[in-house]
Amino acid sequence: TKSVVANQLIPINTALTLVMMKAEEVSPKGIPAEEIPRLVGMQVNRAVYLDETLMPDMVKNYE
């Protein structure tokens, strides 16, 4: 299963857009790639670096 990975540096409190995210096979696994449409508009609660895997605790109100 692919996970959501940052396609660029995403500053803290930024609302996610499609261009900021990509799907990749990573370990450890993060948020599943099929969640990308749901993540659009949600804010990150810390800076996320290029190629960093998005984990559930990095996205505000993600459950």
From Swiss-Prot:
Any one annotated GO CC term: extracellular region
Localization (cell): Secreted
Main localisation: secreted
Keyword Transcription regulation recorded: no
Sequence ranges assigned to domain AFP-like in this UniProt record: 3-62
InterPro entries: AFP_Neu5c_C, AFP_Neu5c_C_sf, Antifreeze_III, SAF
Residues spanning the signal sequence: none
Residues under site feature: Important for ice-binding: 8, 13, 17, 43
Keywords attached to this entry: Antifreeze protein, Secreted
Purpose of the protein: Contributes to protect fish blood from freezing at subzero sea water temperatures. Lowers the blood freezing point. Binds to nascent ice crystals and prevents further growth.
Name the record gives this protein: Ice-structuring protein AB2
